[in-house]
Amino acid sequence: SKSKLSVEQYKKLSIGSLYALQQGGYLNTLSLDIKDKLPTILGEWWGINNAHDARETLDDLCRKGYDYYFPFVYEAFLLDDENAQDDIFQQNMESQEDYEKAVGQLQNLKEVYEELIAYEVITSKEDIARYGVIGWDAGRINFVARACCDMKYISEMEAWNYIDKAYELAHSSFTSWHDMAMSYVIGRAIWGGTNAHNLGMKG
């Protein structure tokens, strides 16, 4: 709804700006106003087709985002020996699914590292640790909550609850919009590797 929002609510919506912008969505209303794209975005990309799927996915995103894997992915990234990298994942991942996700994220980070340097997102490996991936996690929670609300899978009140969680996540992790944006780009790179068109922000 295009109701008047408070300054605080605008601030909270802005956590999802980068993700919303990529999909052509509105930045300053709870509604993204991209209804024609949402069945594809939610159904095909996220596997969300109803209220149950919506809540399950959003709860999972809040509970276990990329930040869950990041300390181990980064630790492995600093090592050259593949067996040592594998040991980190074997010791710390609780399931085969988590193990495979961590391995995939490490591959993507290796793939995009030079690109992130070239585009001056980062200047060193240390910057990856400094920014982390919480910006990506928060952006995804925010966007998916708004998309699910637009599809009437969850209520506006529920959407704001998730948006609040995303805001708290970002607010407690970053002191500037710049750092959050860099974290978003790094998280997106770890998600998609070189196929993510990281710097053109497509997809």
What is each model feature region?
Residues 1-156, 160, 165-203:
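Polar/charged low-complexity regulatory segments
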